[in-house]
Amino acid sequence: MEYRNIKYGTKTERRNYSKMNYDIELPNLIEIQTKSFELFLKEGIKKILKDISPIESNNGDLKLYFDDFYLDKPKYNIEEAKNRDITYYAQLFAKARLENVLTKEIKESNILITELPLITPSGTFIINGTERVVISQIVRSSGIYFTKKFDSKIRYLAQLIPTRGAWIEYEQSNKDFLYAKLDRSKKIPLNKFICCLGFDTKEKIESTFGYNKFLDLSLKKDQILNINEAIIELHSKLHRGEKVPVDVAREFIFSKLFYAKKYDLLAVGRYKFNQKLDVLKRIKNTYLAKDLIDPETNEIFLSKKTFLNEEIIEKLKNKRNCFTFELVNADNNLENEINEEILTYANYNKDKILELYIKDNIINIKTGEILVEKDTLITEQVMNIIRKNGQFIHDKVSKYFLCNKDLYQKHKERKGVFNEVLEVYILDNLGNPKPTIKVIGNIQSENNKQHITVSDIIASISYYLNLYEDIGKTDDIDHLGNRRLRLIGELLTNQFRLGLIISEKNIKDKMSISKFNNITVNSLVNFTSLSAIIKTFFNSSRLSHFMDQINPLAELTQKRRVSALGTGGIDRDRAGIEIRDINNSHYAKLCPIETPEGPSIGLIASLSTYARVDKYCFIQTPYLKVIKNEQGQPKVSEHIDYLTADQEEKEVIASVTYLNSDNTFKEKKIIARKNGETGLHEIDKITYIDVSPKQIVSVATSSIPFLEHNDASRALMGANMQRQAVPLLIPESPIVGTGIEHRIAKDSGCLILAKNSGYVTYADAQKIVITEKPKKTITINNEVIYKNEEEFNYEKAKILHKKNVFSCQTEYKLINFAKSNQDTLILQKPLVLDGDFVNKNDIITDGPATHKEELALGRNVTVAFMTWEGYNYEDAIIISEDLVKNDIYTSVHIDKYEIQTRELKKGAGVEQITREVPNVSAEAIKNLDERGIIIPGSEVKEGDILVGKITSQGMVEQTAYERLINVIIGEKSREHKDSSLRVPCGEGGIVQSVKYFSKENNDILPPEVNENIRVYIAKKRKIKEGDKIAGRHGNKGVISLILPKEDLPYMKDGTTIDIILNPLGVPSRMNIGQILEMHLGIAAQKLNIKVATPVFDGVNNDDLRKIIKEAKLSLDGKMTLYDGRTGEPFDSSISVGVMYMIKLSHMVEDKLHSRNIGPYTLMAQQPMGGRNQNGGQRFGEMEVWSLYAYGAANSLQEILTIKSDDIIGRQKTYSAITNGLPLPKPSIPESFRVFAKELQALGLYVELINSKTKENEILKSLVENQKKGSNNR
């Protein structure tokens, strides 16, 4: 049997034509968002607070600790936050402890850090009432990268990149000298940089790194300095030649590279450093040049000339101590915080610290007072004197007392630099050994250090030098092994750190000028800068997007989107082809098809269907492990491993292939990938196999049936256009699907899922109540309602519901007539009835663009590929009038209109909502309630009043006549201006709801706003000429004609065609999938079945023939059609079938626009552009040329002057028309005046002499010209 009948959810069954023996369940498609945010709450905040704690005052007297944090409960739930236009957030508090170092006094308090926006269960954020999504950013991982530069000769560049901190780079000049750069500063010779690390002689450098001709060249050019001189020179390069003492230079370099607060690799950076610098990763296929001695036994572990293959390297992994050596001693180790110079001042014996005598006087620099004389016994009292005056003391030892450092602990931590060193050689083309090469790696055990170490730097220099000896390999920056995702958790962590650094500085400044007794923790701490940064991130970051809520697929795709743009990412304008292009490592991780068309192409991608991220945020994808069966044959097991791009490199991974029933391979050789290359491999060498054919594409792309028959660019359009589908009034799932429709609907967040199993005890359009089995005996008023061991059935559940036992009931509120971000309708409909039993995670409602638990973006319609009177020329589409009458493509849209009353300045008047609107008829206010607000359910059209509002103008100086009239007729002394909210031009519909907020009701409103009224108007949009519809294969078009049913072509049985498509739209576009879908669709419709044809693994030609035969249709998929106008058959057979067509959001009603009188731009005084500004149509340069061509001088003059920006001419023309006079000659256009002013601003003298008056018109103001114009009239 070629197919299996599979049930998707509880409502839909499809005939699935997949040939795979295994079917791996898709992971949760939005967990990438929710899990990351949960991790941020659990670990991210704690780590940041730990990093900044304690904050210490400049004089060391006060310390502020952040011990713990907690989140308060949100004040408003998700629904309330949306209704009130506020952010769904929780207040983040921390337990702060202020400690006085001298007196050991402590003050504690819970302080508010910020209001933290919370993620919703569907992976979104509610910011100011609107749903937003923070998309993931793909960036280069911190780590070490070696790249090859091609010039006249090959050169290499090395970059040591942290997550936060100074970069280190090595490069080769045109003259072959080697240089190093720290923090993008000026270059320093590499040998001097090596000298800074503790190598003070040429011999020591050569014995450590071995002979390298380029390093030797650098050593000959630059004289080796001692270590201190090298450190001073490195500091001067970083500070533009500034010379400082060696201890200051050493301390600065220490803080730059080895201080955790300024240099951070994160766990991912340490992982990448260790991966790259492992000595055993570099020596494969080389020969050992020297015996390896086991230090434990003093015996030879490996003899020289041993060929280092994978097996030998595995042995070496457990004997790293055989090749671990100290390269730099503790005294010269740049990483040691306490150097030899400081240690000479102090006695290291802990018992004798108080007997230490100071060798020099300690002086207060500010006053010159001797605080402690030399040879004074150091007691606790003396130490307190040092602490109190610490900011005026420069002595090194006193500084360490002041900062309360534990000298002994620091001394204990002092150690030398250890590295793994192996000496190897390789063979030349003739098989002779080349000179010995020293390969140095870092210490792999230092996984906990998240800053760079001297061992790392030495190993990176060795790797760089080894590249010139053909050992090691360069990196592909675009490989996904070198790029990782920054998820919402990490992005928020970065923003938090940025805000806390600013706050830390402010707190330090306050601590330095405050006394412990006069301050409280709350007065000291101010995190307003953090709150501002968090708000800015969610409101205006390039990674925080206004949620695409038009349909469930658009929502889901946006949550799984990956962007290379944004802070710390790539600039769109400077991104080249290489970074936009598809890389072989993208396989099954990033979709090769779905990306935007336009300037962002290749920079924004989507995760593949099965992709997820590991703990370092590298993208992983699952593979099935290939094992040997009892007969020793390779067999696909059920064990799944998730692999990153780096881990895939060493495996042989087969593409999905057909298997025998026992999961062994049918062929001896199959297509597989190794090291990014695809080829034929023997099945014995296969280690993994893909879990599914659809794992290489994204969710949107995998919903396109017959994807494998479409050109890639058309598939891209198909995937993108599905996200633009408008939810229809009557949705219908596709007859021809791919089987993923159910999962898209379930994970999108648009539907309601049952939290627990139970019986439905109440269901209507507003809410659903599910009663679960109680976990204990229920007793009410001494009456046992339910015993724990009893069988639980619907009758018991109904009793519990009637008795209001809320502990075992879950209520689900349905969304009714809500407005989406794109102004479409969000409506949830119950799928369950009273008495139904539901399991946990079952879908209990349908939502927008879903039908019976499946995605339903469009409708299944009968299509024919034929021409009809030229109306479907150039992708135009002809549709049946039935599609309009029967609401097949009707959609509902909701518009929001808002008005506020504000507190105006004193004397400026008052704003109020009222029904008493001046100068309007009773008809205009008939639908307003007593407050002056439109009644829900009213039908409104363009210009109707929605909310009556008047603004009473401030007191004005009245004439004697006005005062007399007011006294006689009793009028108020101020005028009222009508400022009502009206339906805008071109809009209308039925008032769906009204929301009223006011400060009197204690609603949250901006300070100057008293009332806020929102009116929601719903309107049905039927499909019409000019609307855009499309299939799922990139086949799109605009409706050019709506034909009556009687004029349309019809089949032999009288069935009329719904849509006529142009057959010329198929061959050149190479999207043959639409033809196959059409044939399969009509066959499935005849058989009254639904089909699932998964991508790359669906219905093939043989299957299609069998289905067509089963449906008793012609094998060529064509049939005779009859002309509806004449009844005569068309000359030849026509391809007819059923295709799934969707209505796109590009509707003609949003674009149709006309202008009679409208606004003008302030500067140029030309008509505004665009529909929103009631603008005119631009008459541009090319249009002017066309009038030139016809010699239409008068029309051209009118268009360029009085119809555009000739202000005086406009007024004269209006006056002439109203008085029946001939049109006057035009004046100077305002744009010409602006141009002349620009020339004058450049210092040029401009004249425009009037031939009659001989005056310079440019120097005259517009007012003068207007006066002159009125005098002429």
Swiss-Prot record:
InterPro entries referenced in this protein's UniProt entry, alphabetically: DNA-dir_RNA_pol_bsu_ext_1_sf, DNA-dir_RNA_pol_bsu_external_1, DNA-dir_RNA_pol_su2, DNA-dir_RNAP_su2_dom, DNA-dir_RNAP_su2_hyb_sf, RNA_pol_bsu_bac, RNA_pol_bsu_CS, RNA_pol_bsu_protrusion
Record field: catalytic activity: RNA(n) + a ribonucleoside 5'-triphosphate = RNA(n+1) + diphosphate
Protein name as catalogued: DNA-directed RNA polymerase subunit beta
Family: Belongs to the RNA polymerase beta chain family.
Organism, as annotated: Phytoplasma mali (strain AT)
Keyword tRNA-binding: no
UniProt keyword terms in alphabetical order: DNA-directed RNA polymerase, Nucleotidyltransferase, Transcription, Transferase
EC number, as in UniProt: 2.7.7.6
Pfam family, one: RNA_pol_Rpb2_1
Lineage, top ranks: Bacteria, Bacillati, Mycoplasmatota, Mollicutes, Acholeplasmatales
Biological process annotations from GO: DNA-templated transcription
Subunit structure, as described in the record: The RNAP catalytic core consists of 2 alpha, 1 beta, 1 beta' and 1 omega subunit. When a sigma factor is associated with the core the holoenzyme is formed, which can initiate transcription.
Gene label: rpoB
Domain of life the protein comes from: Bacteria
